[in-house]
C-alpha cells in the first residue's frame, strides 16, 4: 500500500502506511530508506532524523540521504567536530556520481570553514559553484573580498547570475556600505531583471533597509 501511495505521489498516505509497518525496518533492506525519504517529502524532516538515529547501528541505515540528514542536523546544532567523523564516512559516496561528490566536497568545505574560521581558497574544481561558495564563505567571515567575488559571479559570461545581486546587497547592507548599494542599484536595468532583483531595487531606491 505504501508503494502504491508513493507511486501515486500521495506522500501523506505513504507515510501512514509505512508508520504502521515499521517492524519491516529489521527485515526489509530498503524499507528504512523509503520510510525516511517519505518523511522528508511529507515535511517531517526532524522525525526522519530521529528514525535514522534510532536505527544507526543497522547496516540499512548507511545510505546517502541518511548521512546527509545527519550532517545537516549537526550543522544546525553547530556540532562541527562531530561532523568530522561523519564526513569521513560520507566520503564513500564521492565515487557514486557527480551529485554525491559535489555535495560531499561542498559540505566538507563549509565544515572546515566553521571549525577553522578560514575560507577554502584552493578548491576551484567546480567552476562557478566554487566561486559562489567562496563568496558566501567571505560573507560568513565578514571579509571585504566578498564584494569583488560577488561581482565576478554577477558579471560572468557563463550564464545569468544576476540573482546573486540580492546576496551582494544583503552583505553590503549588513556592513552598512550604503553608498555602494546605491551605486550598484543605479546600474540595474529593471526590464532585464528578475522579480527578485526588481523588488530589491525598489527597496533600495526607497532606502528600505
At which residue positions do the language-model features occur?
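Mid-chain, structured segments of secreted extracytoplasmic proteins
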Residues: 29-73
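Alpha-helical transmembrane segments and their helix-helix packing motifs
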Residues: 65-66, 73, 78-85, 111
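Generic helix N-cap/helix-start motif at coil->alpha-helix transitions
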Residues: 1, 25-32, 59-68, 94-107, ...
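Long, low-complexity, polar and repeat-rich extracellular regions
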Residues: 3-6, 78, 137-139, 166-167, ...
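Alpha-helical repeat scaffolds
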Residues: 13-20, 45-59, 80-94, 115-129, ...
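Residue-level signature for tetratricopeptide repeat
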Residues: 4, 37-38, 73-74, 107, ...
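N-terminal leader/linker segments that initiate helical-solenoid repeat arrays
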Residues: 1-35, 41, 49
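Alpha-helix C-terminal capping/termination sites
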Residues: 7, 41, 72, 76-77, ...
Amino acid at each position: 500500500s505504501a508503494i502504491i501511495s508513493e507511486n501515486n505521489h500521495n506522500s501523506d498516505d505513504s507515510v501512514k502506511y509505512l508508520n504502521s509497518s515499521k517492524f519491516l525496518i529489521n527485515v526489509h533492506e530498503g524499507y528504512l530508506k523509503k520510510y525516511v525519504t517519505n518523511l522528508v517529502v511529507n515535511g517531517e524532516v526532524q522525525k526522519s532524523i530521529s528514525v535514522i538515529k534510532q536505527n544507526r547501528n543497522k547496516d540499512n541505515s548507511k545510505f546517502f540521504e541518511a548521512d546527509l540528514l545527519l550532517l545537516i542536523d549537526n550543522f544546525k546544532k553547530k556540532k562541527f567536530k562531530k561532523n568530522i567523523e561523519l564526513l569521513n564516512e560520507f566520503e564513500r559516496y564521492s565515487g557514486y556520481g557527480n551529485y554525491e561528490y559535489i555535495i560531499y566536497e561542498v559540505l566538507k568545505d563549509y565544515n572546515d570553514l566553521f571549525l577553522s574560521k578560514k575560507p577554502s581558497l584552493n578548491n576551484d574544481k567546480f567552476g562557478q559553484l566554487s566561486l559562489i561558495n567562496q563568496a558566501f564563505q567571505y560573507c560568513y567571515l565578514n571579509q571585504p573580498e566578498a564584494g569583488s567575488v560577488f561581482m565576478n559571479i554577477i558579471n560572468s559570461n557563463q550564464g545569468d547570475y544576476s540573482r546573486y545581486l540580492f546576496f551582494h546587497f544583503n552583505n553590503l547592507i549588513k556592513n552598512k556600505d550604503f553608498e555602494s548599494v546605491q551605486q550598484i542599484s543605479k546600474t540595474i536595468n529593471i526590464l532585464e531583471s528578475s522579480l527578485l532583483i526588481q523588488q530589491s531595487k525598489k527597496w533600495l531606491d526607497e532606502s528600505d533597509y
